[in-house]
Amino acid sequence: MILVIDNYDSFTYNLVHYIGECNQEIVVKRNDEITLPQIRSLSPSKIVISPGPCTPKEAGISVDIVRESIVPILGVCLGHQSIGAAFGANIIKAPEVFHGKKSTITHSGKNIFQDMPKHYEVVRYHSLIIESSTLPDDLRITSTLIDNPNIIMGIEHISKPIYGVQFHPESIDTENGMKLISNFLNL
């Protein structure tokens, strides 16, 4: 079973739909309606932390889930920022606000980015980013903007199955979005 943490975002159910297309059982819980003991009792095989309209500090249990890291985690947008915050990175205002805009990324080709073109277009909806200079040693960058490598588009933990993407793989205009979700579910 896949647990999706809903950070009160309209894109949450696009993620749920993609996960469902991979024939996965799904439970959706809002970020303020579940506790860590309840998550443990649900025994999810993986957790997806959704986008949302706030900062990681305002994202309910999202950061605590990352700190607990009981199962593999994929964080999307706010979920990605929550991963950064959980390990000590600063979350700052992006140099430019992106809402519904496409950008081209480059990536590591590993884990969630396995078997994908080296560069492809993604859709971004965010005004906050992980400050690259504060990324802790526990995390590594897996994706950046092709035209600005200081803007982090993907991260992963160096020893735990924790992955984050700043962009929205569930957006219809993001290339390879379903592949990224499928890669995570198959890790």
Label each residue range with its predicted role.
Residues 102-104, 152-154, 164:
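Conserved hydrophobic/aromatic beta-strand scaffold that supports enzyme active sites
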Residues 44-115, 181:
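Cysteine-nucleophile active-site neighborhood
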Residues 26-31:
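Short hydrophobic/Thr-rich beta-strand motif most characteristic of the beta2 strand and flanking loop
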Residues 111-160:
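Catalytic beta-strand/loop cores that center a nucleophilic Ser/Cys/Thr
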Residues 2-22:
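Short, charged N-terminal beta->alpha structural module
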Residues 171-187:
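Acyltransferase
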Residues 77, 126, 168:
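Histidine-centered divalent metal-coordination motifs
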Residues 35-43:
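Short amphipathic alpha-helix with an adjacent loop that forms part of the alpha/beta core around
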